[in-house]
């Protein structure tokens, strides 16, 4: 019986594996083409017969990127924005998720529903109101105009996701900690925080990518002070409508991708366990 069951499963398993492989190829091909174009000479990039390989790889595009005067500044600004968003949103989301899970108060369910509704509002619909808000707050042309909106948009998802991790921690564990003399602060940071850390990593990945790749807010809120621009804005330096430098665009995009890949490599184990744990709720 088991043998027949295995034989019936093989075609479906093979079809699933082939489908997964095809999806992986489709997803990875643009990344491969970006890196390939970054190493191609200008003549091959502009050729009317594109080829998925190059016989004469060149570092000229990367040289132009790093010789661009403000590129290092853009990189540092992106790092400051992304790290600030990750740290602040993770801490606030952890405390908020604990509050809405452990405490009983009026409008608690309404608040949770509002977290869900907030995720349905497109960012583009709020860009103009946010522009006037940042103008009135004196935050235009500052990194604060990028950090604050990203924190606001990342918190609903982070709180809702972390709520499942906090809920999975038995209340008996909290009671035992209090019986042993632990304060609420000690329980939060020494017991609960390590237990929900995989969830924090998972939410931090989404927050980091959103802040790192942001172009809309950077273009809308950084108007005149280019020293406050981020890496996505650096692509405009190489893209000119009359004479686009596609090699520079692809090289800059490749450099932009490296920190994200490093971040994924460092947190991949925690990320998998975090996404797996999020399914429980």
Regions found by a protein language model. Name each.
Residues 6-8, 12-281:
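A structural signal for multi-pass alpha-helical bundles of membrane permease subunits
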Residues 1-2:
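Actinobacteria-biased recognition of intrinsically disordered, low-complexity terminal regions
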């Amino acid at each position: 019986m088991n043998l027949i069951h295995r034989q019936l499963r093989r075609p479906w398993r093979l079809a699933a594996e082939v489908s997964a492989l095809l999806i992986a190829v489709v997803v990875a091909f643009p990344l491969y083409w970006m890196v390939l174009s970054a190493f191609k000479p200008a003549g091959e990039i502009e050729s009317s017969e594109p080829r998925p390989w190059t016989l004469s790889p060149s570092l000229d595009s990367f040289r132009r990127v790093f010789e661009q005067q403000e590129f290092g500044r853009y990189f540092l600004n992106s790092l400051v924005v992304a790290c600030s968003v990750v740290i602040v949103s993770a801490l606030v989301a952890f405390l908020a998720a604990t509050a809405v899970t452990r405490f009983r108060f009026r409008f608690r369910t309404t608040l949770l529903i509002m977290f869900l509704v907030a995720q349905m509002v497109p960012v583009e619909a709020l860009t103009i109101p946010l522009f006037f808000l940042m103008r009135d707050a004196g935050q235009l042309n500052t990194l604060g105009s990028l950090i604050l909106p990203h924190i606001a948009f990342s918190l609903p998802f982070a709180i809702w996701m972390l709520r499942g991790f906090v809920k999975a921690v038995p209340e008996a564990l909290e009671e035992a900690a209090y019986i042993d003399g632990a304060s609420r602060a000690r329980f939060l940071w020494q017991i609960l925080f390590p237990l929900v850390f995989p969830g924090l990593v998972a939410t931090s990945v989404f927050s980091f990518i959103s802040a790192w790749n942001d172009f809309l807010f950077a273009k809308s809120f950084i108007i005149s002070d280019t020293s406050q621009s981020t890496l996505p804005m650096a692509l405009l330096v190489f893209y000119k409508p009359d004479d686009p430098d596609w090699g520079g665009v692809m090289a800059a995009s490749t450099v932009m991708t490296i920190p994200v890949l490093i971040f994924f490599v460092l947190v991949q184990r925690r990320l998998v366990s975090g996404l797996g744990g999020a399914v429980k709720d």
